[in-house]
Design a protein with these regions (language model features):
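Extended, low-complexity, turn-rich repeat/linker tracts enriched in Gly/Pro/Ser/Thr and Asp/Glu
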Residues: 190-196, 258-261, 294-295
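Short strand-turn-strand beta-turns centered on an Asx-Gly dipeptide
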Residues: 264-269
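Secretory/extracellular carbohydrate-interaction modules
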Residues: 144, 150-232
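Localized edge beta-strand/strand-to-loop motifs within extracellular or lumenal beta-rich domains
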Residues: 248-262
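Beta-strand-rich interaction surfaces with strong enrichment in secreted/lumenal proteins
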Residues: 170-177, 238-244, 289-291
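Asp-box/BNR beta-propeller blade signature and adjacent active/binding-site loops
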Residues: 1-115, 119-138, 154-156, 228-231, ...
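Flexible glycan-contacting loops in extracellular carbohydrate-active proteins
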Residues: 273-306
Length: 309
């Protein structure tokens, strides 16, 4: 993320923002190649507003692991630091090797999604307190489900002017099994309400977890493109614009293989993307973040599905 110069001591300890998840990858060829890169746990306290000093000021997070093989398929993993963050987790290698994953944001935001942002003032031991970034709202199409709203937030507490840090762009990140070839589909629509000239959503496929509010994600992504809402809604794929209608749900699919990704809108090819950053392990995350510089209504996100080879 954008560095907060006032959070550190100028030497080595600043703020840890990479301890809310723990991942596993496995190899079947003595470490030449790896598969999985799956979240085995997300910190149950990651969305707590008083995270930094919850139950004491000690170091904390879902990092530092040890493991024991239980049988042919199962591994017992001890992970985490702090009495309320340590866990024992049993992982099945067949789950690690799965090729598909699906989510509906209204049901799975707590269990599968990283959606918090930070109050950029250091608290406790190298920590920030948190606030919601993306939030659940009713589906405007009239169904009973909820969906995720990703927008530019109107909250001055998310700004540290002294360090020139601004975490008001809401975002969300979701993990799926890694693949150098794969297909991700997601349903979205423009939210009802006011939009600014630069309102929209940056969509990125990455090979690791980036914080939901990390506006630098696009600079390190394998593939990335924006969804623009003004002056008329469209996807911007290189120099090509693919329009879509507001007030309705749409589906985007990204089919990537090698150095290229084909982007389709509602089942029709909309354009192609060239790989911006290479990774030996392919993509394992999709990241969404607001592009607005002024408070807006943003974009709604419903379902995401992934399948890899």
């Amino acid at each position: 993320m954008t560095e907060n110069a006032t959070a550190g001591n100028g030497t080595w300890e600043d703020v840890f923002t990479n301890r809310d998840s723990h991942h596993i990858a496995m190899s079947g060829d003595e470490g030449k190649t790896w598969y999985g890169f799956r979240e085995i746990i997300l910190d149950e306290h990651r969305n707590h507003p008083g995270y930094a000093t919850l139950d004491g000021p000690e170091d904390r997070g879902k990092h530092q692991s040890e493991m024991v093989q239980l049988d042919k398929n199962r591994i017992l993993i001890s992970l985490g630091q702090h009495k309320n963050h340590r866990r024992l987790v049993i992982v099945d290698r067949r789950w690690v090797g799965a090729k598909t994953r699906a989510t509906q944001t209204g049901k799975d935001s707590d269990s599968q999604w990283t959606i918090h942002t930070y109050i950029p003032q250091k608290k406790g031991h190298c920590s920030y307190n948190r606030k919601p970034s993306a939030e659940l709202v009713p589906d405007p199409s009239g169904s009973t489900k909820k969906v995720l709203q990703i927008k530019r937030l109107n909250d001055p507490e998310l700004v540290n002017e002294k360090s020139n840090v601004d975490y008001r762009n809401a975002g969300a990140a979701w993990n799926f099994p890694n693949g150098t070839t794969g297909l991700v589909k997601f349903r979205f629509r423009a939210a009802d309400g006011d939009q600014a000239d630069d309102s929209g959503l940056q969509v990125s496929l990455t090979d690791r977890l980036f914080n939901a509010c990390d506006s630098t994600t696009k600079d390190y992504a394998l593939f990335t493109f924006p969804i623009r809402l003004r002056p008329a809604p469209h996807l911007l794929l290189g120099m090509k614009k693919a329009p879509f209608t507001p007030g309705a749900w749409h589906e985007i699919s990204l089919l990537w293989q090698g150095g290229q990704a084909v982007v389709s809108l509602d089942g029709k090819k909309a354009g192609t993307l060239k790989m911006a950053n290479k990774s030996p392990n392919g993509a394992s995350y999709i990241h969404f973040i607001s592009t607005g510089s002024q408070p807006d209504a943003g974009i709604l996100l419903d379902t995401v599905n992934a399948r890899v080879k």
